[in-house]
Amino acid sequence: GYISNSLVAKNILDPLNIKAIFFVVLDFINIKNKRKAKEYVASNIYPSLKNEDVPNTYYNMNWTNLKELVNNGHTIGAHTKSHSRLSDIKNYDKLYDEIVISTDIIEKKLNISIKYFAFPFGNKLSFSKDALLIAKKRFDFIFSGLRGDNNNTSKNYVLFRDSINIDFSKFLIGSFLEGNSDFYYKKSKYDMDRWII
């Protein structure tokens, strides 16, 4: 939930009547100033960055920004309470708080129903069977950061997504969209689907 997402929605998506899902972290929404937002990004979202290396544009949307997105027809998805690596959380109550209680708070504050969840960091090593079981009971759709299509599985508990960076070449984007890297992620998806069995 960076403020830049809100600006993209307002200046690009809304005029074209394109709707999007914005995944938000509860603790990040509640930060009141840009310096603290940069510190939060460095410690929770990009832990490999130092505070001074976090771009000045990496500060949070607030409740007003989120309400504006909802009023303009966009969807809010849950992205945990603190952006913790869920596989590191062994306590069930803490995991439940990260995934479910934080979502309940966002729903109440925005007067919406949240059906979508994206787990932090998006890779298999950042998720766990316990987290998946909690999320599966609470959400209709669970999004990963794993590349690939969602047509070749019967379960689809965890959805693949292709992220596109503005710096990617047309060749690289085309390669991803044609599925040339799907095999690399297939085992992770298979393993996560087996967590439900």
Where are the language model's segments positioned?
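Metal-dependent polysaccharide deacetylase catalytic core of the NodB/CE4 family, i.e.
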Residues: 3, 14-125, 156-159
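Active-site-adjacent structural elements in enzyme catalytic domains
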Residues: 11
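C-terminal active-site subregion of NodB/CE4 polysaccharide deacetylases
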Residues: 3-4, 15, 88-197
